[in-house]
Amino acid sequence: MYAQPVTNTKEVKWQKVLYERQPFPDNYVDRRFLEELRKNIHARKYQYWAVVFESSVVIQQLCSVCVFVVIWWYMDEGLLAPHWLLGTGLASSLIGYVLFDLIDGGEGRKKSGQTRWADLKSALVFITFTYGFSPVLKTLTESVSTDTIYAMSVFMLLGHLIFFDYGANAAIVSSTLSLNMAIFASVCLASRLPRSLHAFIMVTFAIQIFALWPMLQKKLKACTPRSYVGVTLLFAFSAVGGLLSISAVGAVLFALLLMSISCLCPFYLIRLQLFKENIHGPWDEAEIKEDLSRFLS
C-alpha cells in the first residue's frame, strides 16, 4: 500500500480563513500572518521639556497647599497679623483680577454675560456671608479633638491634590470635589485659630489660593507660557522659603519632591516610552465613529 503524495505547500497560497480546508499543518504559521500588525500607531511622542512644562501644574498645586499650611502656622503662632493677611490678599486678588481681564481680553466676560459690577457684588456677598458666619466656623469643631482635626485636614488636602483638575481627561478628576475638600480642610484648621477674625481671614485666603489662583494660572499657561514659567518658579521658591522658616528638614524634603516631579519623573517617562509596545490589527474591536444621535430621537 503506497502513501498518497503530499501536496507541495509552497505552490499553494496560504489564506487567513477558517472556513476552507488548506493543505497545511495545524501549527503552520505563514510569513504573512502578521503582515497587518501595527505597533504604537496612536502613541504620543513626548518631548522632555514639554513634559517638564506640563508638570508645572502639579508643582503649582503642591506649592499652594504648602503656602496655605505655612500661612496657617504663622497665624496660629501669632507671627502674622490677620489684618495684614487680609489686606495683602485683597490687593493680590484685585491685581490678579485686572491681570486676568487684560490677558483674557474680555472674551470670557462676553461669553458668560457677567459684568464687573456683578463680580463685585458676588465678592461682597461672599465676604459678608463668611464674616457673619466666622463665629460659627470658629466654634464648629470645638467638640472634636485637635489631633482629629489635623488628621482630617491632612486627609482633605491629599484628596484635594488627588481630585484636582491637572488637565487630564480622567474619571477621577473632579474640580468641585477637589475645591470642597480644600475648603473643608481650611474650615477645620481655621477652627483652631485664636479668634473668629482669624477664622474668617483663613477661609477667605483658602478661597483665593484654591479657587482664584488656579484660574489665573491656567490663563497664564494658555496665553503667556514664559510668564507662567516665571510665576511658577517664583511661587515654588516662596513656598520652599516659607517652609524653611518653620522646618529646614521639611523644606529640603519638599524641594526634593518638587525636583523629582519636575525633572526626574519626565525623564523616566521619556525612558519608559522606549519600552512601550501597543499592538493594533484586524482583531481590534470595531469603533463606531458615526454620529448615531439621529436614530435615538
From Swiss-Prot:
Keyword line: Disease variant, Endoplasmic reticulum, GPI-anchor biosynthesis, Intellectual disability, Membrane, Transmembrane, Transmembrane helix
Main location (coarse class): endoplasmic reticulum
Keyword Iron: no
Subcellular location: Endoplasmic reticulum membrane
Membrane-related topology note: Multi-pass membrane protein
One Pfam family recorded for the sequence: GPI2
Any GO BP: GPI anchor biosynthetic process
A cellular component term, taken from the record's GO annotations: glycosylphosphatidylinositol-N-acetylglucosaminyltransferase (GPI-GnT) complex
Documented effect of changing residue 212 to P: In GPIBD16; decreased function in GPI-anchor biosynthesis as indicated by reduced surface expression of various GPI-anchored proteins
UniProt keyword annotation of Transmembrane present: yes
Pathway named in the protein's UniProt entry: Glycolipid biosynthesis; glycosylphosphatidylinositol-anchor biosynthesis
Annotated signal peptide: none
One GO MF term: catalytic activity
Taxonomic superkingdom: Eukaryota
Residue stretches spanning the membrane: 51-71, 80-100, 117-137, 153-173, 174-194, 196-216, 227-244, 250-270
Function text: Part of the glycosylphosphatidylinositol-N-acetylglucosaminyltransferase (GPI-GnT) complex that catalyzes the transfer of N-acetylglucosamine from UDP-N-acetylglucosamine to phosphatidylinositol and participates in the first step of GPI biosynthesis.
Family that this chain belongs to: Belongs to the PIGC family.
Quaternary structure and interacting proteins, as annotated: Component of the glycosylphosphatidylinositol-N-acetylglucosaminyltransferase (GPI-GnT) complex composed at least by PIGA, PIGC, PIGH, PIGP, PIGQ, PIGY and DPM2. Interacts with PIGQ. Interacts with the heterodimer PIGA:PIGH.
Disorder this protein is connected to according to its UniProt record: Glycosylphosphatidylinositol biosynthesis defect 16: An autosomal recessive disorder characterized by delayed psychomotor development, intellectual disability, and seizures.
Protein name, entry field: Phosphatidylinositol N-acetylglucosaminyltransferase subunit C
